[in-house]
A protein has these predicted regions:
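Conserved hydrolase catalytic core segment
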Residues: 1-35
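Helix-rich cap/lid subdomain of alpha/beta-hydrolase
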Residues: 30-92, 107
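Core-facing hydrophobic residues within beta-strands of well-ordered domains
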Residues: 17-18, 150-153, 161
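Catalytic histidine-centered segment of alpha/beta-hydrolase-like enzymes
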Residues: 158-174
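Glycosyltransferase donor-binding loop in the core domain
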Residues: 54, 135, 162-165
Length: 185
């Protein structure tokens, strides 16, 4: 959801940005937004967040847990370690996640409501839209649609990565950012 937030910021204050590199931003076209918000069916992502385990005995236990099952098991080990070390706080009886499950669930529920899609043609900052494998009904499937709405944008498709692509292959993502930085100096 950081990509959507950056787009919103660039629409308001474009002078703050030389370029945007966005990985599967959560910006839905109107027909998808309506389908998501009017179904009356609870979001599976929100429900999953509410059920997510929020405490562990130790950082190592959390890393072991996340590395053994989807979706975080695809992350490179150093990225997963950083995710846990910075996403949890120590407490007297172990560690607890910094972002409460309810807050995360609300973020998923609200992510489909913003109307940033309608303003994409107004974006005047160079944009690189990066997507992992295109799977129906995922943010990867929408990246090309977003690119079509942003004049002059560049679509980068990495079919060997999923939605956690920057954490699966941080080096490749860093190289792209360096290329964009050099191209927009």
């Amino acid at each position: 959801m950081g990509g959507a937030a950056l787009v919103m910021a660039a629409l308001r204050e474009p002078e703050l940005f030389r370029a945007l590199v966005l990985y599967e931003p959560i910006i839905f076209p109107p027909q998808v937004r309506v389908g998501i918000t009017n179904t009356g069916v609870p979001s599976p992502l929100a429900n999953g967040a509410r059920r997510r385990r929020s405490t562990f005995a130790s950082f190592d236990e959390a890393i072991s847990n996340y590395s053994s099952k989807p979706p975080l098991n695809v992350m490179r080990s150093d990225a997963l370690r950083a995710y846990v070390m910075h996403g949890f706080r120590a407490q007297h009886d172990g560690i607890s996640i910094k972002c409460s499950p309810e807050h995360e669930a609300r973020t998923y529920e609200m992510g489909a409501i913003h109307e940033t899609w309608n303003d994409l043609p107004k974006l005047r900052v160079p944009v690189w839209l990066v997507s992992g494998e295109v799977i129906p009904h995922t943010p990867g499937a929408i990246a090309a649609l977003i690119a079509n709405e942003v004049s002059g944008s560049t679509l980068v498709q990495w079919n060997d990565l999923g939605h956690f692509g920057p954490m699966q292959d941080p080096q490749r993502f860093a190289q792209l950012i360096a290329q964009v930085d050099a191209a927009t100096q």
